[in-house]
């Protein structure tokens, strides 16, 4: 029996959420250990589990993986979500890096002072509408397929949907000028494993609240 991947992170989205999305889309069951105390974090460091002293940490296939980008690349390749050749793979990388840049503007916002937080979220919505979503709308139009790369689901599609939903939590009508992205959102959301992940009771995490921010600050001492 294959051992389930184990995820070590806070009980919130942060940099782990995209990893949860990939595993859930691949239909892979996983376990989670939530960091709630400084002692848990220090033990992981003492045991040599954190390569650069940082989480996310994923235990999978007999390995302890850190660094979000490396983990996502490994999972995408392992679960056939990384294209059919090198040219498709580099496009998937470009698109995923773009959506990650957009999402990080939102992920980091709760840790800022109230006014800075609102400014960061407003900037994220503006960038989504003026920089990122026009690009993906054009990609879908030019490619003429149901997916961003090739003719099958990839990491790029999954992470774009994650980004869309995250921006919509800040500004619900953000896709109003992007009909192809609206259709894309509906289409990808209805893939069975993704549809299940989007239902209440899944391992998808809610938007961060004050408690999550306090726990992260306490554990990481910042």
Curated annotation (Swiss-Prot):
Residues 85-208 form the GST C-terminal domain. GO terms for biological process: cellular response to lithium ion; glutathione metabolic process; response to herbicide; response to nicotine; response to zinc ion; xenobiotic metabolic process. Gene3D superfamilies: 1.20.1050.10, Glutaredoxin. It holds the Pfam family GST_C. GO terms for cellular component: cytosol; mitochondrion. It comes from Rattus norvegicus (Rat). Its main location: cytoplasm. It catalyses: RX + glutathione = an S-substituted glutathione + a halide anion + H(+). Its EC number is 2.5.1.18. Residues 3-83 form the GST N-terminal domain. This is Glutathione S-transferase alpha-4. InterPro entries: Glutathione-S-Trfase_C-like, Glutathione-S-Trfase_C_sf, Glutathione_S-Trfase, Glutathione_S-Trfase_N, GST_alpha, GST_C, GST_superfamily, Thioredoxin-like_sf. Glutathione binds at residues 9, 54-55, 67-68.
